[in-house]
Amino acid sequence: LSCDVFILTAIAANHLSTFKNIENISKTKLKLKECLKSKDNFVDGRGIENKNILEKNKEIVRRALNLLSIDEDLKNFTFTPSAGRGNIIKLHGSEIIDQTYNAHPDTVIATAMEEDSSKTVLVLGDMAELGEDENKKHENLLSKLADFQIFVTGKIFKEVIKKIPSKNINFFENKEDFPKNYLVKQLKAGKKVYFKGSRSS
């Protein structure tokens, strides 16, 4: 394996069931630096302070382009993410954001907090491989995002919502219970709909 640029966006407590702790996650990710043709071509997103994720990501891209001596003008820059990794689907005059490939409660919170809770609906599935504290992490997520209209599914969320009674949180068991008609109405009303979860859900 060899690469021209290595970008580390962040280190989060993902896949704890495999790596056990965040220190092991950090070591594993940083070991990928060995693939670099030039050790200087490393963009460390951990040192980029910006509360807005999109602005932080733009800065990461700018630094990577600079390392590759590519024009930094991002006005004409286009990027199509892989399925489930942030695809934006234009529908009924609004947007569906598809982040169903993978998710972590912390990143869901950070992303959602940048949105207007009165104009955004969240559809969340269980997030896997979080280790022993997975229920607490899901519970914390719902507590932090209590102002949003939220639809949840999955075994973890089914247990967690029992501890957080809220008129804003709705559970659906399966595809048959999926609130399609309601979400279409929200899109037509100009609200964004975020889908976030793991492939397992």
Show the residue positions of the predicted features.
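Flexible active-site lid/hinge loop adjacent to a nucleotide/diphosphate
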Residues: 1-49, 128-129, 133
